Amino acid sequence: TSRFRWGTFSPWLPLQFIYYQPLKQNSNEFKNKEKHLDTDSESNYHRSHRRCRRTRPERLYLMIMRTITLIIIHCSATPEGRRLDFETCRRDHIRHRGFTDIGYHFYITRDGEIHRGRPLEKVGAHCKNHNRHSIGICYEGGLSADCTPADTRTLMQKGSMLALLRELRLLFPKALIVGHHDLNSVKPCPCFDAVKEYRF
């Protein structure tokens, strides 16, 4: 599936979560990397819900084919007490923003589950002028009950985000971890100081 619940594996998020790759009915299709990378007709939702197998790290780099310099953290701007699950967020991006898929690469719900969004090799749609060389991570929340900006992350969300960021830094050791606010001061997102908290 496209979800991972923090606590199932400890203490690290398993690399196989990031290395998941869809299975094809014809194994020979794996040999054609260009065909695999250029296929946009099938939505990521259906790809991510197929059976998956682990991919070696070196194969992952062949799949990504882009330089990652930033890991950008976002919030969904959802008030406390309300839900915005992965599929709802994805539908909103497709129907109301005109995207072909959810704009983020990872989405973390309040229960700590990490949902895979866009494939890492695909450019996201989450931070203007910085999408080409970045990975976007969004957590559900970011607003208090009265709709003011606030760090509403649950302990499970914090644990999942930390584990995910550590694994991504293993893959991209030179990438800077920043918040959306650090690149666009007009926005309070992600409603906490990501640079200070994830200085590793």
Q: Which ranges hold each PLM region?
A:
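Leucine-biased recognition of intrinsically disordered, low-complexity hydrophobic segments
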Residues: 13-15, 23, 30, 37, ...
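Intrinsic-disorder-associated, low-complexity terminal segments enriched in Asp/Asn/His/Tyr and depleted
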Residues: 19-20, 26, 32, 36-40, ...
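Short amphipathic alpha-helices and their capping/turn segments at secondary-structure boundaries
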Residues: 122-128
